[in-house]
Structure formats: C-alpha cells, structure tokens
C-alpha cells in the first residue's frame, strides 16, 4: 500500500502546473523564460498574478493530497511523510517533463500542511517577513523552510527524518540561487 501510494504521489507530483497553465493559456514555457524555473515565482514574473496563484494552489495541492490520502488509509505519520516526499520528488524531477522540475517549496508546504498544519504558520510568517525586507523569493524560502522543523520534531517526531531530507533537497535545488545571492546577482522583485 505504501509503495503504491508513493508511486501515485510521484506521478501526481510530476504534473507541473506552471508548464501546463502556460501551455493552456498560450503563454511562454517557464523553463525557457525568466529564471527558467517552473514554479510560482517565475510564473509571477512571466505570466502574472492569476497564473502564479493557480500554480501555487496546484503545487500546494499536489503535496497535500497524497498526505491526506495516506492519512485516510490509516498510515502512520512517517509513512505519510515519505509519501509526501515522493510527491515533492515528482515536482523536482517530473516524469512528464524530462525530469526538469521546480524547486519544491510550494509542494513541500502542501506536504507539511497535511502532516501538521500549525508548523506551516511560522514558515509562512518567516517567508513573508524575509520577502518584505529583501524582495527575494529564494532567500525567503531558504529562511522559512527550516523554521517548521522544531515544531514538527516536537509534535510529529516520526516525520522529522523525511522532513530533514526534504530540507536538504530544497537547499540543493536552490544552490544556484545561493551562489547568486553571495555574488549579489540574485533576482529581486
């Protein structure tokens, strides 16, 4: 059951809402425009607020839905987290789009929302605060993501290992942004 749900979560995660919405609207391919990342921030830059909001909702949903299905199936918190991580992996390396995906922040937030909703609050607050001062989405994401870990470790310790791995993957996917930040070349809004 766990493996089947993980495979289905990966396949769901492989749906790139940024790419699909761009194709449906006749807009540019987010992998070829702006930052080249098929995610919410790049969609905001190249396609506007409406498509960016739809991308965000879709990416959140594909992280949330597999966790909720795993909960409904009676699986434990750690199994739910691994299944959520499979959805994030699909977002990062989508089967349907030549394994060229996004950075996983919104999908990870959806996963976390399913695992333990109160842990999302400090992360969202930190993201908004850092973004308000820096106008840099990547820095806000990197600052916000680890803030959910202590609360999650306290309330859902079984999910901590998959979440630590998830954080490592998100940092890895932002390595280009980190280099640009340190070089003073990172894009701002």
UniProtKB/Swiss-Prot annotation:
Subcellular location: Cell inner membrane
The entry's keywords: Cell inner membrane, Cell membrane, Lipid biosynthesis, Lipid metabolism, Membrane, Phospholipid biosynthesis, Phospholipid metabolism, Transferase, Transmembrane, Transmembrane helix
One Pfam family per UniProt: G3P_acyltransf
Biological process annotations from GO: phospholipid biosynthetic process
Pathway listed: Lipid metabolism; phospholipid metabolism
Biological role stated in the UniProt entry: Catalyzes the transfer of an acyl group from acyl-phosphate (acyl-PO(4)) to glycerol-3-phosphate (G3P) to form lysophosphatidic acid (LPA). This enzyme utilizes acyl-phosphate as fatty acyl donor, but not acyl-CoA or acyl-ACP.
Subunit structure: Probably interacts with PlsX.
Listed name of the protein: Glycerol-3-phosphate acyltransferase
Species annotation: Azotobacter vinelandii (strain DJ / ATCC BAA-1303)
Encoding gene (name): plsY
């Amino acid at each position: 059951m766990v493996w089947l749900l993980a495979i289905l979560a990966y396949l769901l995660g492989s749906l790139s809402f940024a790419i699909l919405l761009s194709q449906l609207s006749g807009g540019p391919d987010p992998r070829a425009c702006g930052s080249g990342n098929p995610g919410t921030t790049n969609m905001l830059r190249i396609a506007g607020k409406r498509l960016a909001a739809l991308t965000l909702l879709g990416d959140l949903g594909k992280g949330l839905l597999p966790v909720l299905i795993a909960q409904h199936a009676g699986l434990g918190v750690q199994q739910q987290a691994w299944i959520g991580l499979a959805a994030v992996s699909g977002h990062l390396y989508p089967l349907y789009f030549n394994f060229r995906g996004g950075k996983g922040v919104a999908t990870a937030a959806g996963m976390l929302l399913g695992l333990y909703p109160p842990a999302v609050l400090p992360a969202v607050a930190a993201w908004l605060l850092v973004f308000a001062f820096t106008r840099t989405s990547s820095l806000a994401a990197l600052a916000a993501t680890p803030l959910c870990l202590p609360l999650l470790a306290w309330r859902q310790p079984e999910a901590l290992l998959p979440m630590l791995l998830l954080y490592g993957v998100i940092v890895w996917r932002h390595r280009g942004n980190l280099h640009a930040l340190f070089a003073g070349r990172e894009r701002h809004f």
